[in-house]
Amino acid sequence: MRRNIIAVKTRPGEVRFVAVASIERVEAFGNYVKIYFGNERVLHRATLSDMEYILDDRFIRIHRSHIVKRDHLRKLLSELGRYQEVELADETVLPLGGNYKRQLMLELGL
């Protein structure tokens, strides 16, 4: 189910509401995910698959541990002619998983 807001328990007795539009990326972190937005990040008890279901088509999974907002992608980085990493708008470099590379390339028209 696509949502506009995600309710995140940040600590006992506190729930934070995060606008999906503000999310830049999501990273798997054990039984949790780290949600990155602006200069902040919060832990949320969910799987990356749960987040794929919640997030809309502005997001794409690039690795078994990473989902990123499409408009946050800046560069594909290659080594020996094979794209293996992506650089985000904030200059973070993330791995590009083989299982997700083809879909990303198709969506980018490459």
Question: What label would you give each PLM region?
Answer:
Residues R82-R102:
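C-terminal structural segments of small proteins and small subunits
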Residues M1-A89:
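Conserved binding/recognition cores within well-folded domains
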Residues L106-L110:
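Short hydrophobic/aromatic patches at helix-to-coil boundaries
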Residues M51, Q103-L104:
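DNA major-groove recognition helices of helix-turn-helix
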